[in-house]
């Protein structure tokens, strides 16, 4: 049986080494708190305004945007070298468990990544190297969550278009 990390690498097309290259540089020190706040604000503004894929926006219908922004930037700060803001306020991140109530499908991961790529591209003060490292981490982590979701719903998953060397027909 493949590990969740192996599935995440296969489905995302991002190796674990590429995904965790965010640990080579303290991105929090490099970018600063305000950049992470801006990134998360930019991301959730896109999510809550998503009129192309209303099914995706509806996933967040029971969440207050301000809380979603704070949860995300605090997690990013903590994961990328800053103080443990998320854990101090919410406890261990436990990403799979925290996302369990939501439909974490290949389609949802792709839509999340679409909005995150746009947010990264339009958030000032994030250099190209940091964007690449962050996006590799986000892509791998999104599919780690999909793999975790598959454990609880093994018959609901459809392979994603990025699955390395797989025929998705």
UniProtKB/Swiss-Prot annotation:
The keyword Iron applies. Heme b binds at residue 99. GO terms for biological process: nodulation; response to nitric oxide. Signal peptide: none annotated. GO terms for molecular function: heme binding; metal ion binding; oxygen binding; oxygen carrier activity. Induction: Down-regulated by nitric oxide (NO), particularly during nodulation mediated by Sinorhizobium meliloti inoculation. InterPro entries: GlbO/GLB3-like, Globin-like_sf, Globin/Proto, Hemoglobin_trunc. Keywords: Heme, Iron, Metal-binding, Nodulation, Oxygen transport, Transport. PANTHER family: TWO-ON-TWO HEMOGLOBIN-3 (PTHR47366:SF1). Hemoglobin-like protein that exhibits an unusual concentration-independent binding of O(2) and CO. Required for general plant development and during nodulation. May promote shoot organogenesis from root explants. Homodimer when ferric. Belongs to the truncated hemoglobin family. Group II subfamily. This is Group 2 truncated hemoglobin 3-2. It comes from Medicago truncatula (Barrel medic). The gene is GLB3-2.
């Amino acid at each position: 049986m493949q590990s969740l990390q192996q599935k995440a690498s296969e489905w995302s097309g991002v190796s674990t080494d590429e995904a965790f290259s965010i640990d080579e540089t303290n991105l929090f020190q490099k970018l600063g708190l305000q950049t992470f706040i801006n990134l998360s604000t930019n991301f959730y503004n896109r999510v809550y305004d998503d009129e192309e894929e209303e099914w995706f926006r509806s996933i967040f219908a029971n969440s207050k945007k301000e809380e979603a922004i704070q949860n995300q930037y605090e997690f990013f700060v903590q994961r990328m070298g800053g103080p443990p803001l998320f854990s101090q306020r919410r406890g261990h991140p436990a990403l799979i468990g925290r996302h369990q109530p939501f439909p974490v499908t290949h389609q949802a991961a792709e839509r999340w990544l679409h909005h995150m790529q746009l947010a990264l591209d339009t958030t000032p003060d994030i250099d190209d190297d940091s964007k690449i490292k962050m996006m590799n981490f986000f892509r791998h982590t999104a599919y780690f969550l999909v793999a975790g979701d598959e454990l609880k719903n093994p018959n609901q998953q459809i392979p994603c278009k990025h699955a390395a060397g797989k025929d998705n027909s």
